[in-house]
């Protein structure tokens, strides 16, 4: 679909907590070891929110960095959207807390919930407000404190997740061939049982739930792996085809940081050199909706991106959801 207005990335920012949880740390908590974790996931450590830190505080810190990169003030923002599966609370929206932290008292703010696909869902939502001519500057955030819903007695899942936030400022641009030029969003609620965190209106939290440790994330690892392997390759192929990109003209693949083996396998099958995938899962683990914007910010600050470069985003997560996007820097 063609658009008359472009929605470009004017600035990026990210923030991760200082506390590191290494594989050796986890080995002292559950029956695992560094070699086992690295071989199966590529993860060596992850960041964990400390006292006084939350999804909103991480998000606000990333947002401030994105504003600085875009040379804007908080007052220049027309809208704030936060993609998260670990909101500050059921309500108000995490984005409202971020707006208040930035000193704003009338800027619209809301959350998007699509688990690990949440950032691409949020990106598309923000871009469409700009394309409609309604807003000029939109803050798009992916932020998570997954440590708060991780069961550190479950060795199959506690090794995977970390906390962090990434943010971008999307801005109106006269050239519709710049910025977000392609995206596709999908969901299949029939797969809801594959990845879930059950406390809610269907299952109000109770003593029995806590006694059975059911307040934490529940993941069917093998099913997730099969789903991710299939969708990763499919989504990138579709995005490249839609934008007439080749392995030579794609500058960078910025995937959801789910598993090093999945990323490596897909890149090989697609005929893409491994160095074209930006990967930081070894340092942060899986940060769900935050993983893509954190990786994008790091790639940008490392000088890996220049104006005109084509960047592909790809993600999949609970819902089940899956999504991809192409941005022309």
PLM-predicted stretches and their roles:
Residues 294-314, 324-329:
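Catalytic phosphate/nucleotide-handling subdomain of diverse soluble enzymes
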Residues 9-11, 37, 66, 77-80, ...:
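Buried hydrophobic positions in well-ordered alpha/beta secondary-structure cores of metabolic enzymes
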Residues 62-78, 234-251, 299-304:
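Phosphate/pyrophosphate-binding loops at sites that engage ATP/ADP/AMP, CoA/4′-phosphopantetheine
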Residues 38-57, 85-138, 268-296:
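Conserved catalytic cysteine-centered active-site region
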């Amino acid at each position: 679909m063609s658009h008359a207005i472009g929605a470009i990335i004017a600035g990026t920012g990210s923030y991760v907590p200082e506390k590191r949880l290494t594989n050796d740390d986890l080995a002292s908590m559950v029956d695992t070891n560094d070699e086992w974790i690295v071989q199966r996931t590529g993860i060596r450590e992850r960041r964990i929110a400390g006292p006084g830190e939350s999804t909103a505080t991480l998000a606000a810190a990333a947002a401030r960095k994105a504003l600085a990169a875009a040379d804007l003030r908080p007052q220049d923002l027309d809208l704030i959207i936060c993609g998260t599966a670990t909101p500050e609370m059921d309500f108000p929206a995490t984005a409202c807390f971020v707006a208040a932290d930035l000193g704003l008292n009338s800027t619209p703010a809301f959350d998007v919930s699509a688990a690990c696909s949440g950032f691409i869902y949020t990106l598309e939502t923000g871009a469409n407000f700009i394309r409609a001519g309604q807003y000029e500057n939109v803050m798009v955030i992916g932020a998570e404190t997954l440590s708060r819903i991780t069961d550190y007695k479950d060795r199959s899942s506690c090794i995977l997740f970390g906390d962090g936030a990434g943010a971008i400022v999307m801005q109106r641009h006269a050239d519709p061939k710049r910025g977000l030029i392609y995206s596709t969003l999908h969901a299949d609620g029939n797969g809801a049982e594959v990845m879930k965190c059950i406390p809610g209106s269907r299952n109000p939290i109770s003593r029995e739930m806590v006694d059975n440790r059911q307040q934490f994330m529940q993941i069917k690892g093998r099913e997730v792996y099969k789903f991710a392997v299939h969708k990763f390759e499919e989504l990138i192929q579709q995005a490249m085809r839609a934008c007439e990109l080749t392995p030579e003209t794609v500058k960078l693949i910025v995937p959801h940081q789910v598993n090093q083996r999945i990323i490596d396998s897909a890149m090989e099958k697609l005929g893409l050199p491994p160095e074209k995938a930006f990967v930081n899962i070894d340092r942060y683990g899986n940060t769900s909706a935050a993983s893509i914007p954190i990786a994008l910010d790091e790639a940008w600050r490392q000088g890996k991106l220049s104006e005109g470069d084509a960047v592909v985003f790809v993600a999949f997560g609970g819902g089940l959801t899956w999504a991809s996007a192409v941005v022309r820097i």
